[in-house]
Amino acid sequence: MKPPAAQGSPAAAAAAAPALDSAAAEDLSDALCEFDAVLADFASPFHERHFHYEEHLERMKRRSSASVSDSSGFSDSESADSLYRNSFSFSDEKLNSPTDSTPALLSATVTPQKAKLGDTKELEAFIADLDKTLASM
């Protein structure tokens, strides 16, 4: 639950924040006012909105997917690939497929085993054993 001083206007919340210097309090107040304005805009009917969020979102998607080189010599797509490879949100296919940056650690004769969708013999045996144990109780 929010303290009573933090409820109400964004300016009151910024003023109630302890030990903020005036610049930080002003920045916080500005951010909270902008946030309130966006929420109010979303609450209004679609045709009365002040900003076209869908167009902005599409423009940002196009910008982020475009391959534009910066001064570092790396393109955005190369940066995105390395970020994608270092992410924890891989699918099994991405984890088990080699990439250009993956060192060739596995020899051609050693291939990792993948579990198959119908490969449940150990689980079935465990469940059958559990059923027998429960039946004997």
UniProtKB/Swiss-Prot annotation:
* Induction trigger: By Epstein-Barr virus (EBV). Up-regulated in aorta endothelial cells in response to complement activation.
Q: Which UniProt keywords apply?
A: Cell cycle, Cytoplasm, Cytoskeleton, Nucleus, Phosphoprotein
- UniProt note on tissues of expression: Detected in brain, heart and liver (at protein level). Highly expressed in liver, skeletal muscle, kidney and pancreas. Detected at lower levels in heart, brain and placenta. Detected in aorta endothelial cells. Overexpressed in colon, breast, prostate, bladder, lung, and ovarian cancer tissues.
Enumerate the GO terms in the molecular function aspect. Answer: protein kinase activator activity; protein kinase binding; protein kinase regulator activity; R-SMAD binding
What highest taxon heads this organism's lineage? Answer: Eukaryota
- Residues making up the signal peptide according to the UniProt record: none
Q: Which GO terms describe its cellular component?
A: centrosome; cytoplasm; cytosol; nucleolus; nucleoplasm; nucleus
Positions carrying Phosphothreonine: T111
Residues with Phosphoserine modification? S67, S69, S71, S75, S91, S97
Q: What InterPro entries does the database record attribute to this sequence?
A: RGCC (IPR029252)
Predominant localisation class:
cytoplasm
Query: What's one GO BP annotation on this UniProt entry?
Result: positive regulation of stress fiber assembly
The residue ranges flagged as biased composition, category Low complexity, are 65-80
Relate the assembly described in the record.
Interacts with SMAD3. Interacts with CDK1 and PLK1.
Its name, as the record gives it, is: Regulator of cell cycle RGCC
Query: From which organism does this entry originate?
Result: Homo sapiens (Human)
